[in-house]
Regions:
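N-terminal [4Fe-4S]-dependent radical SAM core
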Residues: 1-37, 82-84, 330, 335-345
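Short catalytic/ligand-binding loop motif for oxyanion handling, primarily in non-cytosolic enzymes
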Residues: 47, 57-60, 98-100, 131-132, ...
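Accessory C-terminal segments flanking Radical SAM cores
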Residues: 2, 219-345
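Canonical Radical SAM [4Fe-4S] cluster-binding loop centered on the CxxxCxxC motif
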Residues: 23-70, 303
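Active-site beta-strand/loop signature of hydrolases that rely on acidic residues for catalysis
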Residues: 93-94
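Glycine-rich short-loop/terminal segments
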Residues: 43, 52, 74-78, 262
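Classical nucleotidyltransferase
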Residues: 153-273
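Radical SAM/AdoMet-radical enzyme domain recognition
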Residues: 72-77, 81-90, 99-202, 208
Length: 345
């Protein structure tokens, strides 16, 4: 393994993307894992300049606790009918930690662990809550087979080394308690060097960093990057398992070539940086092995806006089998990692 942990030992540019016939999260492929990506509300205590307008509000719009409990039960019932009894619940917002019952929700999931093959939880957060909140969180998180956090680093709010270190200390606390951490940094090209320096600040403290390309508000191609910038985004900051002593590079997604050979990337976001996210007319397990909940509406995925499965109030129906993808591309990594394969296979 390279002593320089900033760069990947694995050359992602060698992957023959035009010859790939199937891909997916390793856990979803190998462990029959059902994936739930749930936006608990759009309320956020931040208002970042580059945040998409639809992604946040200053009005508190949290999903009621009883609705959350009933939804969890119904998801598990339908998923089990399809043969899935391992679950990954990814909770986000807005800012999910300001949901008044966030810790109650993950306690509810923890109370049913013994009735599942396993349960994992994930949180996407700006981690602005005080460290006291995280001390409560880790006591619940340790009950799960796996708990993880994507911590969104926003330069407009973490504008001093003191604030950055306070942010890091919360994450190091969680990592010391077995929670897998990655810090998500949207690489605005106008501040690229500054943001790369901030990424190194955390990376040097043995915290994973995801350097994420910036997209315009309605999706589409990346904003303008130089070749050097794009190379850094595509190859920098490999994800490592810092909860293990050997810090091995962690590979999340498995890809299969048409000759049967296997390729790997450490995170689905890496595929998007290479522009490998157009799976229209492929068979996709979105809606069958995973769903997206936006406030009170249930969707097949984030990108499949036209394919509604129902609502939390009136009921929803998960697909009984994989279906053809009808969307031009997967705009976020949550969609990209869902297992899928070419129709001709």
């Amino acid at each position: 393994m390279s002593q320089d942990l900033t760069w990947s030992d694995y050359d992602y540019s060698r992957i023959p993307f035009n010859e790939i016939i199937s891909l997916g999260s390793k856990s979803m492929i190998n462990d029959s894992l059902f994936n739930v990506s749930w936006i608990l509300g759009r309320y956020c205590n931040y208002a970042c300049s580059y945040c998409w307008p639809h992604a946040h509000t200053n009005s508190k719009d949290h999903t009621p606790l009883e609705v959350c409990y009933n939804t969890i039960d119904e998801i598990k019932r339908q998923a089990r009918e399809n043969g899935f009894n391992s679950f990954f619940f990814s909770l986000s917002g807005g800012e999910p930690t300001f949901h008044p019952h966030y810790l109650d929700i993950i306690k509810y999931l923890a109370n049913d662990i013994e009735n599942t093959n396993y349960t994992a939880v994930h949180m996407t957060s700006n981690c602005s809550r005080k460290i006291k909140w995280f001390k409560e969180y880790v006591e619940i998180a340790k009950l799960f087979r796996r708990a993880s956090i994507t911590a969104s680093m926003h330069r407009e709010y973490l504008d001093t080394n003191e604030k950055m270190q306070e942010f890091a200390d919360k994450l190091l606390l969680c990592q010391d308690h077995g929670v897998n951490i990655t810090i998500n940094i949207v690489m605005d090209p106008e501040y690229f060097d500054e943001l790369w320096s901030k990424a190194m600040f955390f990376h040097e403290q043995r915290l994973n960093v995801t350097v994420k390309p910036m997209r315009p508000p309605l999706g589409g191609t990346f904003v303008n990057y130089t070749e050097e910038m794009l190379w850094k985004i595509q190859n920098g900051m490999p994800q490592r398992n810092y909860t293990l002593d050997n810090n091995t590079q962690h590979f999340q997604v498995e890809l299969t070539n048409k000759d049967g050979s296997k390729w790997y990337v450490d995170q689905a976001e890496r595929l998007n940086t290479f522009g490998f996210n157009n799976f229209k007319n492929w068979y996709c397990n979105a809606g069958y092995q995973g769903i997206v909940i936006k406030k009170d509406k249930v969707h097949r995925s984030y990108g499949c806006k036209e394919q509604h499965l129902g609502t939390l109030q009136d009921g929803f129906e998960i697909f009984k089998n994989p279906k053809i993808c009808v969307t031009k591309n997967c705009v976020i990594s949550t969609d990209t990692k869902i297992p899928k394969h070419k129709v001709s296979v």
